[in-house]
């Protein structure tokens, strides 16, 4: 535990460098919903400057204000002063926890350590797929495994249809999400995943979750993994899909896949192969609005998170008139499906899920024609 907040040169410079221009207000999904200044990056930088200068005390209110951020990185990309507010927020969250301001994610950290997933589920899924040696190993992540099971089943089915020689493991949470909310990644869980993955003899790890992808690529806990890491869109982009969808299709860029990982083109390459009526929303690629699920925000403020997703759905429908919304992130998928209302006449899938359904439809049509 630390005794006081740390104001090193990097953090001090970031806080002072904020010019208070307010550009971040136009791209912050939480401010867009609440209109409260403290919820955008400028508001947080002003708050932290007051604390740094001793004008405001370190308090529970400061800790709670720091949780009102999805770490979507939109403010960072739109900051003319070159400040990275979401990185400041994440590092400040750790310091606040270190000072004893445990937030509601303390319980999640304990659950992850005890059960190996963020939901406290006691039983692991049996997906009915082989576990053993293979060139590729598929890693699903907590949200897909425990909250979007049907999407995962379709992804597995798609890989089987494409004759991919892959295996699966008894995975546990990568635990990277704990880093976002002020706690530390569980090294023992990382080691368990590494051991299980290396047993397969695989040369490539394919992950369906952009956040897991980032953890495997970026976090020192996984430096000994020794595999080529690919998000599933990177893996699938060169396949020749023999299916088409005639409905108007659009795509939402997940923050973790897009702004954080820089993966924009691969999902679109896949979509354009199967969807001739593909149309982009107005705010897309690095300018896409967040769905409200990231940075622990859905866990801390679930009602507001769903409202943000609902706002994003309305934007997309108004911009595109699409009949099908695709993404490739289990958290985005889960939040959008929870937010969808009757007025949203929109099918929502992960790309892999749609592809599997298209193949299933083609097989059905062939049977009917026979």
PLM regions and their residue ranges:
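Acyltransferase donor/substrate-recognition loop-hinge adjacent to the catalytic core
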Residues: 237-248
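Cofactor-cradling patches in redox/metallo enzymes
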Residues: 82, 143-231, 256-370
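Iron-sulfur-cluster electron-transfer modules
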Residues: 8, 12, 39, 45-208, ...
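Long terminal accessory regions outside catalytic cores
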Residues: 1-37, 50, 54
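Hydrophobic alpha-helical positions that pack around
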Residues: 251
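Short functional micro-motifs and their immediate structural scaffolds
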Residues: 23-29, 33-36, 77-84, 260, ...
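Cysteine-cluster motifs in flexible loop/terminal segments that predominantly coordinate metals
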Residues: 18-25, 72-75, 292-300
